[in-house]
């Protein structure tokens, strides 16, 4: 297992859940956290602990976003009209790295961030190398012509473990995707239950 995979699956082990629904997750074989003390029975979490865990799980799912960046996203979500938890999910799903992952151009969130940083993605015909770039409905995302035959791309499009959600239209023959709309929490194909309302409670303490 590579260092990148180890870091990724460490999040699974810490949460005790296969948060991306990957067949190779070690949580599929055991239900305790990482490290030598991972097998110890855990007591019931306090309300604060439950809220913190919900935040850590969502941050981890989106390739371990830093606390500073995640809190900034939360603040932005609170400024928008409507439910803050729903807005939080909407902003996260509009991130370019999330859309690249959802479109099955790469196999993981972590790979999507690296793929974008290395300049393999265009938005509306222009190269964008910022993973946190906010995609808008109607935007067209594409893999650069020179990158379409990379093994990481060809393998990802064949993954049977997940489908492209209906708020994204993907054409793998052309390696393009169109972002149709901002999804609601219920639209997002999370492998485990995400609870943004608990994150709102956490930051509202």
From Swiss-Prot:
| SMART domains named among the record's database cross-references | Ribosomal_S4, S4
Q: State the oligomer form and interacting partners.
A: Part of the 30S ribosomal subunit. Contacts protein S5. The interaction surface between S4 and S5 is involved in control of translational fidelity.
Highest taxon in the source lineage: Bacteria
Boundaries of each S4 RNA-binding domain copy?
A: 94-157
Protein name according to UniProt: Small ribosomal subunit protein uS4
Q: Which family does it belong to?
A: Belongs to the universal ribosomal protein uS4 family.
Point out the gene that encodes the protein. rpsD
Q: Which Pfam families match?
A: Ribosomal_S4, S4
According to the UniProt record, where is the region Disordered? 18-46
InterPro entries recorded: Ribosomal_uS4 (IPR022801), Ribosomal_uS4_bac-type (IPR005709), Ribosomal_uS4_CS (IPR018079), Ribosomal_uS4_N (IPR001912), S4_RNA-bd (IPR002942), S4_RNA-bd_sf (IPR036986)
Could you give one GO CC term from the UniProt record? small ribosomal subunit
Q: Which SUPFAM superfamilies match?
A: Alpha-L RNA-binding motif
Q: Name one GO biological process term.
A: ribosomal small subunit biogenesis
The species this protein was found in? Bradyrhizobium sp. (strain BTAi1 / ATCC BAA-1182)
Going by the UniProt record, its keywords in alphabetical order are: Ribonucleoprotein, Ribosomal protein, RNA-binding, rRNA-binding
Q: What does this protein do?
A: One of the primary rRNA binding proteins, it binds directly to 16S rRNA where it nucleates assembly of the body of the 30S subunit.
Single GO MF annotation: structural constituent of ribosome
